[in-house]
Amino acid sequence: MKTRKNIYFKVVALAAIAIAFAMPAKAQLSDNGYANIDWQFNAPLSNNFADKASGWGMNFEGGYFVTPNIGLGLFLNYHSNHEYVGRETFQMGAGEVTTDQQHTIFQLPFGAAARYQWNRGGAFQPYVSAKLGAEYAKIRSNFSMLEARENSWGFYASPEVGINVFPWVYGPGLHFALYYSYGTNKADVLHYSVDGLSNFGCRLGLSF
């Protein structure tokens, strides 16, 4: 697990540095474009399979302001939530199994985003946004040397409120956001059923 965490944070750091050097050396993009890359913290709401909050996620978004305040763009993010289930006996096929389990839900939504942003060009730029698209989810249980899983597709919707802060004349700014998301994904794994994936979380990253 420690090695996995180290790899994750190295990937995040390298991605952030790469984007920072690829962007123009201004506090914001020189035209009407915008972009942000974020670390993501996620707390699942009532999915009864893997409902432990985690910081195993990232968010990517970019777009273009079609008016002075309205921006349209694309997004993609991913997240993994995990939960350990203690030793129990349950039915599997024609027999019974007694074991502990490691549950995981991996979510990968992507699609279109729209935002309304205030004070463009200023140091503090609050906004509200909505994301709509599709969500791929992998719901799995690992136990003993076995794995039970189901892949699911669903519709995804997510309102968001956030702020971009540009404290420097040059370089990228800071991005902070709170969001709620809901996916219509459904799955049946072993004796568990998942009917919809809802989450509340926050994002912290770089804004361009």
Regions found by a protein language model. Give the residues of each.
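Cleavable N-terminal export/targeting peptides
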Residues: 1-31
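A general secondary-structure boundary signal
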Residues: 2, 67-71, 79, 107, ...
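Short glycine/proline- and aromatic-enriched beta-strand/turn motifs that initiate or cap beta-hairpins
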Residues: 25-66, 71-72, 207
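Residues that define the transmembrane beta-barrel architecture of outer-membrane proteins
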Residues: 31-33, 52-56, 104-110, 124, ...
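Gram-negative (and chloroplast) outer-membrane scaffold detector with strong preference
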Residues: 32, 41, 61-143, 154, ...
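Membrane-embedded beta-strands of outer-membrane beta-barrel proteins
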Residues: 37, 58-60, 112-114, 128, ...
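Outer-membrane beta-barrel translocator domains and adjoining extracellular loop/strand segments
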Residues: 47-54, 84-91, 138-147, 186-193
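Predominantly the C-terminal beta-signal and adjacent terminal strand-loop region
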Residues: 80-87, 162-208
